Amino acid sequence: MDIRLDSRRAIQAGPLVTTGRIAGAALRMARPFLGIARRLQFKAKAFELALRSVALQLMNDAMADADEAMEETEEDADALGGPRQEVRAVSDGTIVTEREMTCPQNRYCHECSWTGAAAGQNVAAKGAGAAVPGPNRRTGSGERRGYG
């Protein structure tokens, strides 16, 4: 048995060298895949940017459509000559106008027949208490805080 050959192999096959060889072989085998991964990563980034661009464009279009619809609604209200009333849908499906939203009872309902100036009599007649005409006194606007 030739000691040189065995010792050379033993030296070359030491733990660090073996690890280095394995790592080198793994890198050599993975090199084509790393190139593909880099190209795919670049393509994924470009795809992500394209998706963001499309999403941003869709959002801008939707905002423009919403603004246009609001302007048309305001023009229709002006053409009818009536006061502008913001109309909103409540979670149970009923439609409530701004006047109903400013009910002093802070309710999104038709219980008290809130009709602005005549609301005091309507609310008192139903025994719900005195009404305060005008905007909602609790929130300072027509916005609601709860379901009342």
Curated annotation (Swiss-Prot):
Bias type Acidic residues, positions: 66-78
Residue ranges, annotated region (Disordered): 66-93, 124-148
Alphabetical keyword list: Nodulation
Sequence ranges of Low complexity compositional bias: 124-136
Induction field: By plant 4',7-dihydroxy-isoflavone or derivatives.
Role description: Involved in efficiency of soybean nodulation and in nodulation delay.
Descriptive protein name: Nodulation protein NolJ
Source organism (scientific name): Rhizobium fredii (Sinorhizobium fredii)
Gene: nolJ
